[in-house]
Each structure stands twice: as structure tokens, then as C-alpha cells.
């Protein structure tokens, strides 16, 4: 592990913790909400978190490329390192007061994820990993589960924003695995889904329609916790491909085999749109206040 990566880990940790604290300050207040496209929300909290993270990263690493969900790419494309930032992964959850959202900061060297920091906004947990150094939650080592049978597994997935318009919408896969496992969850934050695969609380994760900022950090967490991350067919994962399969390793071959057998369900219903403006008569949604009592243990 190079000194350059360790420096970036420290700065990413600082940025994630400060952004998490900032996002918690919005809890209990009201949020101005926009709908970028059906089901895809952005709030003032997203933008404030992104501004804070960008300020910290630019101050320390002006030469690095930065790709964020809200602002796109910044910096020289010739940079050796590229940051993948989701300032609020789980915006819809956050806007509704559902406590499952995260700050996700990943780092690529070339096209390879080498560093990941994920801060659970509501619980305050801090997940960190660097290639070759293992993975931690609140500075304590984490490992994937040893579940070796699909029938004993708990999986997690998600659905893309275009799920109403395409037959390749993950509905068939969701139904398929629901019958084969102890359950399939839909968390609403890819970063936290992957973090919980890394801790062993979930055994596997698959999803399509992903962006690099959704998964860059989580990929490193799962790998460094002893898990496996690939494309659906087992080939090396590309963070820009939009598809991902992650598991504890024990289940990976079985998950690949089952995914290959699933046929998409036909889209037989049109998207129903309310003719009224989004969130008519309320410019913002209330977010329930949650009290936090968290402490980051220093090494």
C-alpha cells in the first residue's frame, strides 16, 4: 500500500464523516426536493454534501479526477486517481425519512477500485477499505459470511430508474431468487447493500442500471472483506458497465448460474403519471428527526 493511498484514505474519511454530519443536520427539518426524472430525486442535502466533499478533495488533491452524481466529471482526465462520489446514496429514502442512506467515496486507479469509504448517515457507522489492507467498520475488521447454500442465504438487490420502460428491469431476477433463498431485500442504497455483504449480514447482491459512484467504494469493501465481485457472467467487473454481482464467494458460482437462467418478464403496464406537479402543495417533505449516539473509535 502506497503512502499516496493512505493519504487519500485519511482525507476520504474526513470528507465522509463531515458530509455524514452535515446530512444529519437536515434530519427533522424540511427538504427542497426536485425530480430529475421519474423516481430519481435530488435534494438540497445532496448538493450541500457534494459541495463539502468536493471542497475537501480539491484542497488536498487538486490533480485528481472527481466524478460525482450531481456535477459530473471535474479535473484532468490524465490524473492517476479518479474519485467516484455519491454525496447521498439513498436520496429517496432520505427524503421520506426512511433511515437507510449513505455517503459513498470510492477511488479508482486507472479503472480499478482501490479505496472505499462509506458513511451510514443514520447509524453513523463508518466502513473503510484499501486494496491490500482489509476492510473495517468503525475501525474493527469485518469479514463476509460463510453461507454456502442459496437456500440459507439472504440477498439484496435494487431496481433502476428505467424499470417501468424496459423488460430488463430485474423483476424476474427478484422473483427467481425470492423462491430460492431465505429472502431478498431491497435497501435503496447500493453502497450500504455492498457494505452489509462485506460485514456478512447479507450474503450476496446483484443489480443493473448502476453508476460508478454507486459501487466503486462498495466493491473495495467486499473484496477486502474476503468476498468476490464480478460481472453477472463472472468476468472482471467494470464500474462503468452498470451491472454487478457481489457475494461472500461461497455462493458466487450458484448466483452466476441462476442469473444466466432468468428470462426477463414482459413490461405489460404503462407508467402511471400523476398529472399534478410532484409533491403538489408542499415544496418540501418533512424528515423525521433521529437522535444519534455514535462514536468513532480511534486507532
Where are the regions a protein language model picked out?
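Short secondary-structure boundary/capping segments
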Residues: 33-34, 58, 73-76, 118-119, ...
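Small-residue (primarily alanine) positions within well-ordered alpha-helices
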Residues: 12, 16-19, 49, 116, ...
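N-terminal subdomain of lithium-sensitive/metallo-dependent phosphomonoesterases centered on the IMPase/IPPase/PAP
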Residues: 1-88, 250, 257, 266-299
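DPxDG-like acidic metal-binding loop motif
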Residues: 77-136
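An extended, acidic
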Residues: 143-299
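Residue-level signal for inorganic ion chemistry
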Residues: 23, 46, 57, 91, ...
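Generic detector of well-ordered alpha-helical packing
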Residues: 47, 51, 70, 87-90, ...
Amino acid at each position: 500500500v502506497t503512502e499516496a493511498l493512505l493519504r487519500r484514505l485519511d482525507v476520504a474519511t474526513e470528507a465522509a464523516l463531515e458530509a455524514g454530519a452535515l446530512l444529519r443536520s437536515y434530519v427533522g427539518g424540511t427538504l427542497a426536493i426536485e425530480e430529475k426524472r421519474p423516481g430519481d430525486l435530488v435534494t438540497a442535502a445532496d448538493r450541500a454534501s457534494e459541495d463539502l466533499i468536493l471542497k475537501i478533495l480539491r484542497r488536498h488533491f487538486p490533480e485528481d479526477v472527481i466524478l460525482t452524481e450531481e456535477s459530473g466529471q471535474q479535473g484532468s482526465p490524465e490524473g492517476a486517481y479518479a474519485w467516484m462520489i455519491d454525496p447521498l446514496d439513498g436520496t429517496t429514502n432520505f427524503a421520506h425519512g426512511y433511515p437507510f442512506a449513505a455517503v459513498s467515496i470510492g477511488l479508482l486507479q486507472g479503472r480499478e477500485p482501490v479505496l472505499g469509504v462509506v458513511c451510514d448517515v443514520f447509524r453513523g457507522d463508518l466502513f473503510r477499505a484499501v486494496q491490500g489492507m482489509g476492510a473495517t467498520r468503525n475501525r474493527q475488521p469485518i469479514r463476509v459470511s460463510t453461507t454456502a447454500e442459496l437456500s440459507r442465504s439472504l440477498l439484496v438487490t435494487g431496481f433502476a430508474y428505467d424499470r417501468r420502460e424496459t423488460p430488463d428491469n430485474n423483476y424476474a431476477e427478484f422473483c427467481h431468487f425470492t423462491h430460492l433463498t431465505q429472502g431478498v431485500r431491497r435497501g435503496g442504497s447500493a453502497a450500504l447493500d455492498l457494505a452489509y455483504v462485506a460485514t456478512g449480514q447479507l450474503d450476496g447482491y446483484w443489480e443493473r442500471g448502476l453508476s460508478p459512484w454507486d459501487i466503486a467504494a462498495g466493491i473495495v469493501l467486499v473484496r477486502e472483506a474476503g468476498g468476490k465481485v464480478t460481472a453477472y457472467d463472472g468476468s472482471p467487473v467494470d464500474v462503468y458497465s452498470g451491472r454487478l454481482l457481489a457475494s461472500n464467494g461461497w455462493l458466487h458460482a450458484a448466483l452466476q448460474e441462476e442469473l444466466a437462467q432468468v428470462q426477463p418478464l414482459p413490461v405489460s403496464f404503462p407508467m402511471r403519471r400523476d398529472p399534478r406537479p410532484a409533491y403538489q402543495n408542499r415544496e418540501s417533505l418533512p424528515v423525521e428527526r433521529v437522535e444519534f449516539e455514535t462514536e468513532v473509535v480511534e486507532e
